Amino acid sequence: MVVGDVTTGTDVLVIGAGPGGYVAAIRAGQLDLDVTLVERDAYGGACLNRGCIPSKALITGSKLAHDAGNAEDLGIHANPAVDLSQMMNWKDGVVDGLTGGVEKLCKANGVNLVEGTAEFSGEDS
């Protein structure tokens, strides 16, 4: 984590690695700009880490269990039991894989990653 002023120059400074931030940073890197991306939490933002993706992963697992238990018309006889701890671990693996992918894409496109918080200050910011 960086505490204090960052005095090194950069062409583009992006604050926040959510879906807008990391895409902007990657594109700037593809354009051969010197780009720095500052993120205080995990890459991907709220949707990837705490919202859309984890929710959909759990819904998918729950639907699979439900469908397996209601498929007797197809000749499938099952009484699935959900191990919530294992399902949560699977969901965490899905999220970790995607956040890791965002980080790798950033690095592959020359984005300098900084863990911390940032703000613009001064008359010209």
Feature-to-residue mapping (PLM):
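Glycine-rich flavin
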Residues: 2-4, 8-9, 26-33, 38-125
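Beta1/beta-strand and adjacent pyrophosphate-binding region of the FAD-binding site
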Residues: 4-20
